[in-house]
Amino acid sequence: MNIKIIVVGKLKEKYLKQGIAEYSKRLSKFCKFQIIEVPDEKAPESLSDAQMNEVKVKEGERILGKIKDRDYVFTLEIKGKERSSEELSAEMAKLATYGNSDITFVIGGSLGLSDAVMKRSNSAISFGRFTLPHQLMRLVLTEQIYRSFMIQAGSPYHK
């Protein structure tokens, strides 16, 4: 199985890099895992709606350029469907069973995802209604992917 997370922007915080590196190492036993960073679009503090949309479109084009036709795409969206860890694990296992071995998760930039990226999505997921920094979300998502494999393996890690 190939799993990738496509994210907008660079990760700077050392403690987040260390956490992601730990889970990436653990994931290597179950899948080929990678995080792909695409550049964020530089924008002034206050933007009109049209300017915000332009930023999302440019970032969206970069994201879409990293998605392959065969990829099953989960986008992280505020209005996405909330899932438990068990539900995400079952969904990933079902995808693998039915031949979807290339899974991509997408975390947008600070303004969110473009309409084109959301349209490409096979499934929109949400980690709740609260807002998390995009950098922290990388770690949370990476841990949940690892947890999904642990649930499938019947490991006590999930308890």
Swiss-Prot record:
It is an enzyme of class 2 (transferase). Keywords: Cytoplasm, Methyltransferase, rRNA processing, S-adenosyl-L-methionine, Transferase. Transmembrane segments: none annotated. InterPro entries: Alpha/beta_knot_MTases (IPR029028), RlmH-like (IPR003742), tRNA_m1G_MTases_N (IPR029026). It catalyses: pseudouridine(1915) in 23S rRNA + S-adenosyl-L-methionine = N(3)-methylpseudouridine(1915) in 23S rRNA + S-adenosyl-L-homocysteine + H(+). Pfam families: SPOUT_MTase. Specifically methylates the pseudouridine at position 1915 (m3Psi1915) in 23S rRNA. This is Ribosomal RNA large subunit methyltransferase H. The lineage of its organism: Bacteria, Bacillati, Bacillota, Bacilli, Lactobacillales.
